[in-house]
Structures are given as structure tokens and as C-alpha cells.
Amino acid sequence: MITNMTKAIQQIMLGTVTKNEKQAAESLKRIKAAGYDGIELNGFMIKPTSFLVRMLTKAAGMPVGKGGDYDWNALVKEAGLVVTSIHEDLGTIKREPETVIREAEKFGIKYVVITGMYRF
């Protein structure tokens, strides 16, 4: 029986409610108020991405916007949440494992989840 479970949401679910940093902060606070403890960050939503990636993800129903410009570490902490993991595409993990590890360490986490696809 699990007795100490962290309830978290995936950042990719928040694309439409994180159009600017203020809206992202408000959304994260609402997530905390709804009973969540944490968030799984998405690698291509916490780093600046190209226009093409933003358009492809938007067309796929997963708008990522310009969230890569936000200070996600501060936003998550201010909302009282924790980062549970980062999910990253397999191509980036294979090409830049040390960069992915440093990113995880920056957020104080030890888990990186593979999205199962290569970056666009």
C-alpha cells in the first residue's frame, strides 16, 4: 500500500493556460489549491523553442508557447509545488545526456521521463 504519494500534473496539460508568465503563476497556484503537490515539467516547454516546434505542437493540440522564457523554478516554488520529474524527448537524452542531467539537478530532481518520441 502506498502511503506517501505525490499528486502531480504534467506541464504539457497547461499549454493553454500558460500564455504568459503571470498566467502561468496563477495557473500553478490554482493547481496547488486543487490539491496537487507537484508538476512534471516538459523539456521543450522550459527551454526556448523554435517557431516551427511551437507551431507543430500547437497543431497537435499541445501548445507550448514561449514558456521557455519563464523562470519555472521560481514559478513552481512560489506556487508551493515541487517538480517531480522532467520529461524529455529521446533524441535530446541521447545527444545531450549531461545537459539533461544538469537541467534535472537545477530543479532538484532525480527523475527524467522519456516522452517516447524524438523532437520535431
Where are these regions (language model features)?
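Short beta-strand elements of ligand-binding domains
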Residues: V113-T115
